[in-house]
Amino acid sequence: MSSSIKEVQGAPVKWVTNWTPEAIRGLVDQEKGLLDPRIYADQSLYELELERVFGRSWLLLGHESHVPETGDFLATYMGEDPVVMVRQKDKSIKVFLNQCRHRGMRICRSDAGNAKAFTCSYHGWAYDIAGKLVNVPFEKEAFCDKKEGDCGFDKAEWGPLQARVATYKGLVFANWDVQAPDLETYLGDARPYMDVMLDRTPAGTVAIGGMQKWVIPCNWKFAAEQFCSDMYHAGTMSHLSGILAGMPPEMDLSHAQVPTKGNQFRAGWGGHGSGWFVDEPGMLMAVMGPKVTQYWTEGPAADLAEQRLGHTMPVRRMFGQHMSVFPTCSFLPAINTIRTWHPRGPNEIEVWAFTLVDADAPAEIKEEYRRHNIRTFSAGGVFEQDDGENWVEIQKGLRGYKAKSQPLNAQMGLGRSQTGHPDFPGNVGYVYAEEAARGMYHHWMRMMSEPSWATLKP
């Protein structure tokens, strides 16, 4: 990839169907802050992503409260692979491929529920809640040698593929790769920023309001990057009308200033990132209203959160936080929407979103969270529409030839972030920056070009 935008204007696109490590490394230049647009639209790159990114990363599936009782299940995805997340008799959680080992039909066709077993609707192979094959119709007649009495068919060998499962403070993640680092190592120095939403109270968190799902015709990286690194859009054009519309009538519009104080965090490894405003709660008030804002900043719940987390960072001074855990887990603490961007080819995603609240929050506060998330960050939410419109139009442009012929600029805050911030841990810079985005794309490039954990691991 050229080191200068001017040098490549009008240059021909280099079409690649067999992506070598060298070619992939040329797609992202974090030192110069340049991105090759083909990372968002190339089919062959996407197919490699399914193997090297989604086949090796820890992926968010849901929350422990989605499957509270034995046999409770949630059918979801890891990349494009359908999986089932099931609560076991010993209260652990298993995740296995939603695929019958006979001809590949799904063994679970419900979104969620409770089951004692999963039976394939094609030929009737049945699996227990641990994913063990327990019944095959006409097993003796069809698979056994009647003369010798030796069946030669071992059901224990024909269960669905099992994923690794780990939880972090209520969130359930899974990973196909046995060589990948454990979840806490994978999350690394991003964990304190996750705790701002997940660990405010000893009671933990609970999911409310069900799982909302919708489709956006855009590449998954646009969504993941925005939640990882992009406060810029919220403070400039995209959400200003929605913020003004959501302000309480008693709030003076002259106080609706665009915040200027804040920071951005880039994970030391892993492509995770976060950003937030400092000491400026006006945007939270406009998005979530006075009751949630007061709950988050004042009173017993805020005091308890400060006691639990204040030794790490001044959580009471943080507002409007956004965050992504690479590759596709994103959330907004205080607003408390959390979602997974399930990829559906290079040009489409399914958004699966739910609302998370403190388990011991008053019923009134839980209802406020549910109501405001429907209004703001849901399939019909005002801010969700703003974001989706931008991503869709970008993706439309990338259908063209010239649109993929020159690099995109990711140079905001280049070289300015550093460790040693007095208030916030890790690599921290100014809120209006793209350091976390550069970290995300650099890690994407490494996962795509380094097939071995021997070089990729933290």
Curated annotation (Swiss-Prot):
Catalytic activity: biphenyl + NADH + O2 + H(+) = (2R,3S)-3-phenylcyclohexa-3,5-diene-1,2-diol + NAD(+)
GO biological process, one term: catabolic process
Enzyme Commission code(s) on record: 1.14.12.18
Root EC class: oxidoreductase
UniProt xrefs under PROSITE patterns: RIESKE, RING_HYDROXYL_ALPHA
Pathway(s) it belongs to: Xenobiotic degradation; biphenyl degradation; 2-hydroxy-2,4-pentadienoate and benzoate from biphenyl: step 1/4
Cofactor note: Binds 1 [2Fe-2S] cluster per subunit.
Cofactor(s) annotated in UniProt: [2Fe-2S] cluster; Fe cation
One Gene Ontology term of the molecular function aspect: 2 iron, 2 sulfur cluster binding
Binding-site residues, Fe cation: H233, H239
Keywords: 2Fe-2S, Aromatic hydrocarbons catabolism, Dioxygenase, Iron, Iron-sulfur, Metal-binding, NAD, Oxidoreductase
Domain of life: Bacteria
Boundaries of every Rieske domain copy: 58-156
CDD domains reported in the protein's UniProt record: RHO_alpha_C_NDO-like
Keyword Flavoprotein attributed: no
Family statement: Belongs to the bacterial ring-hydroxylating dioxygenase alpha subunit family.
Quaternary structure note: Heterohexamer consisting of three BphA subunits and three BphE subunits. A ferredoxin (BphF) and a ferredoxin reductase (BphG) must be present to obtain activity.
Record-given protein name: Biphenyl dioxygenase subunit alpha
Gene name in the database record: bphA
